[in-house]
Amino acid sequence: AAILSDRDFLRDAPHSDLTERLNFLLPGKNPDSAFRIDRAALQRVKAAFRQLTDKTFSSEDLQYCGILPAKAYPDRIARARSPHSGEYVLSNGVTAKLRPDDDMRKHEFLCAPVVEGAGAVPTIYLSAELSLPELERHFPELIQEKTVAIWNNETNALNVFREKRL
């Protein structure tokens, strides 16, 4: 929550990966970053984090990096329009894009809690990877399953299959 509410402490970072930002909250770790760090913003995030929880944050907690913001912002669950395109359709129907050099574009599903920008397609500034099994487990209401039947002219046969859609 603190990372989402304050300005990004990783200045000039071309990627939106929430996991990298959470690494800065791990106890005893001061991860290296190739990007300029706004130390004051980082200290505010750390202070807010300490106020919100008495639990020690560990690297095992990073596995929930996509699920937790998706629970808070289910309308920001996103699926890539096409592989590696960087353009995503959010569950609220809005199309948003990652910046061109954002490594997060390799993921089919994301939670994009920070999306900003005016114009035709807003930009995703903060995102976390989600997997299809995570979505099926934690958000079954977003998965629609139906039977599809398509006639195949080449084989003169009816092909029937189950299709899942987010």
Where are these regions (language model features)?
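Second RecA-like catalytic domain
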Residues: 1-166
